[in-house]
Every structure is written in C-alpha cells, then in structure tokens.
C-alpha cells in the first residue's frame, strides 16, 4: 500500500526534512552516511584492510568528530563483513538497496522512492526480512557504542587540555557557587548533612535490551576504546580479531527473549549495572567531590547523601507477578551482590596491605582487630593489617550466611588455607564501616595514608552508601487495591460492612479510629482472600527485610492513583496490621511511628491540581505531625510525568507539575516540614525525559533544596549507565545540578514571574484543549492509534514482566484511557511522530499571538515569550526538549504508518491534523527561539541524528511492511519475529524511548 500523500501531507513532510539539520555534502560526512555495508569496491574489502588511521586532533568541529566518523564506518564495515560471511552477498545487496532507497525517501521525499521501497519490501521472504531488520538494528546499536566512545574521548581531551570546567561537573558547580558567594564551608556542610539524592532504577514494559546483547556490547565498547591507544601491529590485529568475534557473536545471538521477562530477570538486569558501574563509580564520585572541594580550599565531611533506589521487586502496581517472594528474592540478590563485592575487596586488601609492624606502627584499635582474627599463620605475626582483614573477611562471610543462608556467596579460605571459621556476624553495616575506618585511621597515623586511597577508602565509602542492602527497594501499589484490602479486613472484623462505599469523611473516621486502637484487625484463624494475603504478605516481608538488612533496605511506600487523604491513611493501617507501624496515632504517650514513609503519587492533571489540598488535609490529621516528626520531619511526594502527559498533553503536564511543586513547597514551608520531591521521569520527553542537568535546574525555586529522587527507566538505564565512564558523569550531573539548584540564587526577578505564569496558564489551557480534542474527542482516534502504531504488537513483545495495558481487553473494548502511559509514548516513538512531546504547543501559541487585537500587541506578546525563553529556566528547558523531539519526528516516515489505517477518510483526517499541528509548532518554536533549524543550540545531537537516522529509517519501512503482513493474517513466525526485532532496533536508534 502506498503512503498517504495529500498535498498538505507532502508539503509538511518536505518541511519536516527542511527543519532538520541540513545534510552536509563533504566527504567526511559521506564517510558516516555511507552504508555500514556500502556496496562499492572499497566496502567489499575486509575491515582489516581499512583499519582507521590515528585519531585526528584538529580544532574544527568536523576534525573533532573525525574519530567518530571513523569508528562508525569501521564498525559498519565489520558488520558488513559479518553479514556477508553469515548470510551471503544476496542479503548484503538487499540491505544496501533498501538503505539507499530509504535515504532518497528521507532527503527528497521522493514518491518514486516510496514505490520502489514498497515493491522491494514486498518481495522479501520472511527469512530475508528478519536478516535485514537485524542488520539495521545492530548498526543502530554499534553506532550508539561509537557515539558513547566519542563522548568519553572528547571528555578526556577536554580534561587533558586543562580547559575550563564543563556544565554538569562538580568543578563547574563549585565555580558558580564561589562566584555567587554561596560556597562557604558551613553552607556546603549543611547542604551535604541534609541532602538526599537518589536515582531509582525501575523496570518497565519498554525495556527491550537482553542482557546477553548488553554484555556483548560492553565488550565491543571496551575493544573500541583500546583502538585509541598506540597499538603495535600485532596488538591491533588482535584487537580487530576480538572485535570481529564479538560482532559475529552478536549476529549469532538471539536479539529477542523467547519468553516474557520475569521479575527475577529484571532484578538480575538491574544488578548488572551495579557490577558494571555503580559499585566502583559511586565511591569514585564521592572522592571527586572531596577533591573538588579541596581545590577550592573548602572542607566538608560527606555523609552518604547519594544513594541508589529500586522499584524492581517492590512495584506491584499493575503487576500481579510481584509478591512477597519477589521482594525477598530482590533483597536477597541485592545483598548477595554487595557481600560478594565487599568480600572481594577485603580479600584484595589482604594482598595489598602487607605492612609490617617491624617497619611501621599500628594503632591500638588496629592491633585489637588483628588480635581477634582467626588467622594463625606464623608468617603474618608482624602484619596486623592482613590479620585484621582476615578477621573482617570471616565476619563478612558470617554476616552473609546468617542473612542469606549457607553457600549464598562464594567464600575463600580464612588464613593458612583453613576452612572458613564460624565468626561473629556484623550486627549491621555500620559496624563493618567502623572496622574499615580503624584501618584507615591507623594508616593515616603511621605515614600510610596513601595506602588507603586506591581501595580501602573507596570500600569504606561503598559500605556507607550501599550498606548490606545495596539499594533501597520502594513498595508501590494502587490505591484501589488498598481500599479493597481494608474493606475486607473491616468487614471480617465486624467494624464496617462496606468501607469502600463510605463518603471520604466517614472513611477517615473509621481509619483514624482503628489507628488509635492498640488491637489488630486481623482475626487469627479466619480465611482471607488471596488479595488480602498477598498484600499483607508483602508488608510482612518488608518488616523482615528491615530487620535483616537495616531500615534503609525498605523505607518507602508509594501509593499510585492518590486521589484522597484516605488513600494515604489506608496504608498506615496496613502497616499497623503487619507490625511496621508501632504506637497509636494521636496518642501523645505512645505516638505512632511508621516504618515506611507513606508517599502519594499524583499522576493525572486533576490529581496534580488537588495535591496541595490532600497534603494539607493529611498533615492536619491528629497524630500525623508526630508521625512526620519521627520520619526526621521530612515528607516525600511523588509526581508522575507519564499519566499527566497522556491526560493533558506535553505543555499542560509540565505546567501543572510546576504549579503543583510550587504549591507543595509553600505548604511544607508553612508547616516547617522538609519536602522531598520524587520525580517519576521516563526516557521520552513526553514522560519527563530529556537532559537531567537542565531538568533539575529548571525546577521551580525552592523545590530541590538538596532533596531529590528521580526514576531511571527503560532504555535510559542502558544508555546512561551501561558504560562506566558515561555512568560516572551522569551520576555527577545529578549531584552538580542539585547543588546549583539548591544553593545558587534564582535569576528571575519576582516582578517578572506573574506575567510569565499568567501567559503559561493561558497557553496550557489552550494546549490541553487542542490535545484532548485530538486524542479523546476525535471520533475514530482510538482506531487510528491502534492501526497506525505497533501498540498491539508491543503488548505481545516479551519485554517486561508487567502487562502493557492496565486491563486485558479484546480489540472491541480497547480504550486509550485504559492503556498504560509508557507503551502509549513508546508507540508514538516507533511510528516517528513522538506526539507526546509536542502536540498542542503550536495551536496554543498561535492562538495566543493571533488573538492579539493589534500588531503591536502581537509583537508585545511574542517579545514576552522570547523573554520567557531567555530568562526562565523552566520555559527554556521545555522548549529545548520540544526542539529535540521535533528534530526526531519524521512526517515522511510517519505517513507510511498512517497508510496502515484501513479507513481512508479517518486516516486522512487525523494525519492531516497532526501534520498541521507539527507545522504550527515548528513555526512558533522558531519564532520564539529565533532559530529556524532544529537543534541549532545542540549541534552534537543534531549531528548524531544526521549520522544515525538514515539507518533507522529502513527499520521503520520494514516494520510497516511486516505489520501489513501480520495484520493481513500471515502466521509465519518470522513475520512476528521481524516486527519485534524492528521494535527493538527503532528503540535503540531513538535511544530515549523508555
């Protein structure tokens, strides 16, 4: 089927290309945009015949990027060689033909190219199709690796040159603080004492990378980095052989999972990032901060203010596969990983700290540690550090054994080759930290301080940060589930027959009455439903987990769909029933103390607007102020970016989040309570994604204040933390931005804000009306969405453990409202419209400007928008993110997905509305920013899109062809497999998709 081409659509698609970064015609650019398997004589040579020349070190942008071009070309040739070896020249030639035709279609909006492409794709056998999809998918993955390598390369060159510090680094943040007079030691010490910064890893239905693929890609990245070094001919040949082997391994490795990912798989996937990045890089980050402070003559003791969190194993919202057993497995596996790390590091320290007390002294505390060690070797009687470390090792082994069971972690012999002794376990991780500091202090007192720096100090820091639990696991469940559990408990206890039907005030009366009672609700011998047993079982497991691994192991309970105060109080009562809440609410003699902080999640537009009222009413309840006091006088509130976007569109979601944050800060300041905001950000801009540094700095004044948690999801986890160097910088960026957002004075004069906010409110109202008119009020839009995107196929893909829809429905009962926000956004990315990151903005701004009663007033309104862009971080960040999304949008490719809609009239009507809005949005964005080209302010990303997207487009064209076959009833397993492979490849090419 040909793509839909009304005049307007064709014009818009052409405009879309014009708005993108211009295609350069230089030979260097052609190197990159040549096929990974270019069908010419030179490309037919083996990759080894064209090893890259030494990396250029020129000053022009093109020279700086030359090594990147070489790497992409080199990896592409390697892939081409492997493709020929594995599949033959015929498939290789098909890949090249499709690539060239797709490039023509992209650059020229060539209708003849579209017809040629259609014909070629229809002629492919299912086997050929799968091979072609895999080729382009792997090229996307390899191009990502090359880009990451180049980022590391440029960062290193920058540091070696001694250039000025870059935004997003601790050094840059401290320089800004010093300039602003906000960097005195007492100020910074207070900041670190009160700060809590926590990235939280979550598993989601759109996380599509298999661990086997990630592992192979890590190897490719490492080998590619080696090529920047001066290698001998033999070393280079060996490097190339290893690279060829890994690319061959990738080609022969299944890209997709055979079965749906289990929660246990998701846990292991997350743990791989700890081994690859977090265990080493987080302690290194602390050391970097200390070093940067010292360079400015500042001294501040760093408590463990930066920690890691996780939802994996504790997030039950919409996922029936998460149970008490899952939570137990999650914390057990996390603990096993951290115990293995500690024991490995202590073992290595035993080899390194060979200090003899015949040559250097030791503190009395260190001698005591050595004296109680089980080590009896006559060869180490004068080596107190080694003996102390052997004792610490056996205590760690015992600590793991009592918490995890026999044989849970590998244990080495404890001195003289003897079997591990039954040592006394550490009571908690703090005791282990104290022992490590005994070693550090003793070395410092006896001229051995340099010996602590390489391993001992980082280990002590790791133990402070990770404890015996590695990461705090949040519990999350939907408010309606809690209500059902409470209803059953109250009914069985004879307290209230139908709690769920009560008005809100009556619900609160019942809940508060029960929380004031010392007795439990549960009857000891009564039978309860599976739901009640499962929910209470999770909370009981959380109590046991806290007892075993410390209070930090599980400390938060998030209630999704929080709409009322009772939604929060219900969880307090459930904690009481499971021993997590002690005392009685409102009783001054025995005040309630909750083990888990009850955290509301406000997601929809109405809920965000209601958030301050709910929190005000909660704090006003008798005894809640004492409960919050017990929590350190802190209260966390989570804000959801996904559902608010799906509910009201990009602009309104951002604005309502901004308003809710300001209102919450005002309320909490008034009550003298510290507010910590938890940002439920995703990978896509429509779900709060975008550069973290700018996102944090654009938060409303006073809303960060050293306290922030934020989710890391989907593909973002792999792209941010798969590479240790990039992972370290991403972690540093979060700290740097939090420092600046908390301590720097905000630049906008209060007099400007009212005008800005009034304009934003007008734009938001208009944008939401435009968005909802399309998504929720257009007859047939539901059918358009389900037919023009691979949403149904995404639901089938074995990506995550959670279903893609909140309900399982047959096609006749599908509703946009029931669809999870994450696959909703993911689907718009797949068809290259990325509608969730821009739709409605153009109409809103155009109406705002065009409704001006005079040209002078229009000019004034536009000038105000320009001022907002230049001086208001919130608005500037919003436009920057939208700019990125518009650059990634491709109307020409999207038109081919529109052609999948069976109702031609519906197809034309909806797609032309989307195209018209894209044109309006691009036009007004250019008017406000003064930049006619997309990503004019972000040339790095502009080049990335230009270099990679010609290889992404064929995947879209192939996906459309496969969707046609699948929906026409083709039952060939390779067709379904090809669709799923294309979903994977497009996600990799877009990068921020989760």
Curated annotation (Swiss-Prot):
Q: Disulfide connectivity? A: none
Gene3D superfamilies referenced in this protein's UniProt entry, alphabetically: Phosphoenolpyruvate/pyruvate domain
E.C. number, please?
4.1.1.31
Which UniProt keywords are present, listed alphabetically? Carbon dioxide fixation, Lyase, Magnesium
Cleavable signal peptide:
none
Keyword Lyase listed? The answer is yes
Q: Where is the composition biased (Low complexity)?
A: 9-24, 34-57
Give the cofactors, semicolon-separated: Mg(2+)
The superkingdom of the source organism is Bacteria
* GO CC annotation terms, alphabetical: cytosol
Report residue spans for region: Disordered: 1-67
Q: Which Pfam families match?
A: PEPcase (PF00311)
Residues in the active site? 204, 646
- Give the EC class as a word: lyase
Question: Which catalytic reaction applies to this protein?
Answer: oxaloacetate + phosphate = phosphoenolpyruvate + hydrogencarbonate
GO BP annotations, alphabetical order: carbon fixation; oxaloacetate metabolic process; tricarboxylic acid cycle
Family (UniProt) = Belongs to the PEPCase type 1 family.
Provide the function of this protein. Forms oxaloacetate, a four-carbon dicarboxylic acid source for the tricarboxylic acid cycle.
Report the HAMAP family cross-referenced here: PEPcase_type1
Its protein name is Phosphoenolpyruvate carboxylase
């Amino acid at each position: 089927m040909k793509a839909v081409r009304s005049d307007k659509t064709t014009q818009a698609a052409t405009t879309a290309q014009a708005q993108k970064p211009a295609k350069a015609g230089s030979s260097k650019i052609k190197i990159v945009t040549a096929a990974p398997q270019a069908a010419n004589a030179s490309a037919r040579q083996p990759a080894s015949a064209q090893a890259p020349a030494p990396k250029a070190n020129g000053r022009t942008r093109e020279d700086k990027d030359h090594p990147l071009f070489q790497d992409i070309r080199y990896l592409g040739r390697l892939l081409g060689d492997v493709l020929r070896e594995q599949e033959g020249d015929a498939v290789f030639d098909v890949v090249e033909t499709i690539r060239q035709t797709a490039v023509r279609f992209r650059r020229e909006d060539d209708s003849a190219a579209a017809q040629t492409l259609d014909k070629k794709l229809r002629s492919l056998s299912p086997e050929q199709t799968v091979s072609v999809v895999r080729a382009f998918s792997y090229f996307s993955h390899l191009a990502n690796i090359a880009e990451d390598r180049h980022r590391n390369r440029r960062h290193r060159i920058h540091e070696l040159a001694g250039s000025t510090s870059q935004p997003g680094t601790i050094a840059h943040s401290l320089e800004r603080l010093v300039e602003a007079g906000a960097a005195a030691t007492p100020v910074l010490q207070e900041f670190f004492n009160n700060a809590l910064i926590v990235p939280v890893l979550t598993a989601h239905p759109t996380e599509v990378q298999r661990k086997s693929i990630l592992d192979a890609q890590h190897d490719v990245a490492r080998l590619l980095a080696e090529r920047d070094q001066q290698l001998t001919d033999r070393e280079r040949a060996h490097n190339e052989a290893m690279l060829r082997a890994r690319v061959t391994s990738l080609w022969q490795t299944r890209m997709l999972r055979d079965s749906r990912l289990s929660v246990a798989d998701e846990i292991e996937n997350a743990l791989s990032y700890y081994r690859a990045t977090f265990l080493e890089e987080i302690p290194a980050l602390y050391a970097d901060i200390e070093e940067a402070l010292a360079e400015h003559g500042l001294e501040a003791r760093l408590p463990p203010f930066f920690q890691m969190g996780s939802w994996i194993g504790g997030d039950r919202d919409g996922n029936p596969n998460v149970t008490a057993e899952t939570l137990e497995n999650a914390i057990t596996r996390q603990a096993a990983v951290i115990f293995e790390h500690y024991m490995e590091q202590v073992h290595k320290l035993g080899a390194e700290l060979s200090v003899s007390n015949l040559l250097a002294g030791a503190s009395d505390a260190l001698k005591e540690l050595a004296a109680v060690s089980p080590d009896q070797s006559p060869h180490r009687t004068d080596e107190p550090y080694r003996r102390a470390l052997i004792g610490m090792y056996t205590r760690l082994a015992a600590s793991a054994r009592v918490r995890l069971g026999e044989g849970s972690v590998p244990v080495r012999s404890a001195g003289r080759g003897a079997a591990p002794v039954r040592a006394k376990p550490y009571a908690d991780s703090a005791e282990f930290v104290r022992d490590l500091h005994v070693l550090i202090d003793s070395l410092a007192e006896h001229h051995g301080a340099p010996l602590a720096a390489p391993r001992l100090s980082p280990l002590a820091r790791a133990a402070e940060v990770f404890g015996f639990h590695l990461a705090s696991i949040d519990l999350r469940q939907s408010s309606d589930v809690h209500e059902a559990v409470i209803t059953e408990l109250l009914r069985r206890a004879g307290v209230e027959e139908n709690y769920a039907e009560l008005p809100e005030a009556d619900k609160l009366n019942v809940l508060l009455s029960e929380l004031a009672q010392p007795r439990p609700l549960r009857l000891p011998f009564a039978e309860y439903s599976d739901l009640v047993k499962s929910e209470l079982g999770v909370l009981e497991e959380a109590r046991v987990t806290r007892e075993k691994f410390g209070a930090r192991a599980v400390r938060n309970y998030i209630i999704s769909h929080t709409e009322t105060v009772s939604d929060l109080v219900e969880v307090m009562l459930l904690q009481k029933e499971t021993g997590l809440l002690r005392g009685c609410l409102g009783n001054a003699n025995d005040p309630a103390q909750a083990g888990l902080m009850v955290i509301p999640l406000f997601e929809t537009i109405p809920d965000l607007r209601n958030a301050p009222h709910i929190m005000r009413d909660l704090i006003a309840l008798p005894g809640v102020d004492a409960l919050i006091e017990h929590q350190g006088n802190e209260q966390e509130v989570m804000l959801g970016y996904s559902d608010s976007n799906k509910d009201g569109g990009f602009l309104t979601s951002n604005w309502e989040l901004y308003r809710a944050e300001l209102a919450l800060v005002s309320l909490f300041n008034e009550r003298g309570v510290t507010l910590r905001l938890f940002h439920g950000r995703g990978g896509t801009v429509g779900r709060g994604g975008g550069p973290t540094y700018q996102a944090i700095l654009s938060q409303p004044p006073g809303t960060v204040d050293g306290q922030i948690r934020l989710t890391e999801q989907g593909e973002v986890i792999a792209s941010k933390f798969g590479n240790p160097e990039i992972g370290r910088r991403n972690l540093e960026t979060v700290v740097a931005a939090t420092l600046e957002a908390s301590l720097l004075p905000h630049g906008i004069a209060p007099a400007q804000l009212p005008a800005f906010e009034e304009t934003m409110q007008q734009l938001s109202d208009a944008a939401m009306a435009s968005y909802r008119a399309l998504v929720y009020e257009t007859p047939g839009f539901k059918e358009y969405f389900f037919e023009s995107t691979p949403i149904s196929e995404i639901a089938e893909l074995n990506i995550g453990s959670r279903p893609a829809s909140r309900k399982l429905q047959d096609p006749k009962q599908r509703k946009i409202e029931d669809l999870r926000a994450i696959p909703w956004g993911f689907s718009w990315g797949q068809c290259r419209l990325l509608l969730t990151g821009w739709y409605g903005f153009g109409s809103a701004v155009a109406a705002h400007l065009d409704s001006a009663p005079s040209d002078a007033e229009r000019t004034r309104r536009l000038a105000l928008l320009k001022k907002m862009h230049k001086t208001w971080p919130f608005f500037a960040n919003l436009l920057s993110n939208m700019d990125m999304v518009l650059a990634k949008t491709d109307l020409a490719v999207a038109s081919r997905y529109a052609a999948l809609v069976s109702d031609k009239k519906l197809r034309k009507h909806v797609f032309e509305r989307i195209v018209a809005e894209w044109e309006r949005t691009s036009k007004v964005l250019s008017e406000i920013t003064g930049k006619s080209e997309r990503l004019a302010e972000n040339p790095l990303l502009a080049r990335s899109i230009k270099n990679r997207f010609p290889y992404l487009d064929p995947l879209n064209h192939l996906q459309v062809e496969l969707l046609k076959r699948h929906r026409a009833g083709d039952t060939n397993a390779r067709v379904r497999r090809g669709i799923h492979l294309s979903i994977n490849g497009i996600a990799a090419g877009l990068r921020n998709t989760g």
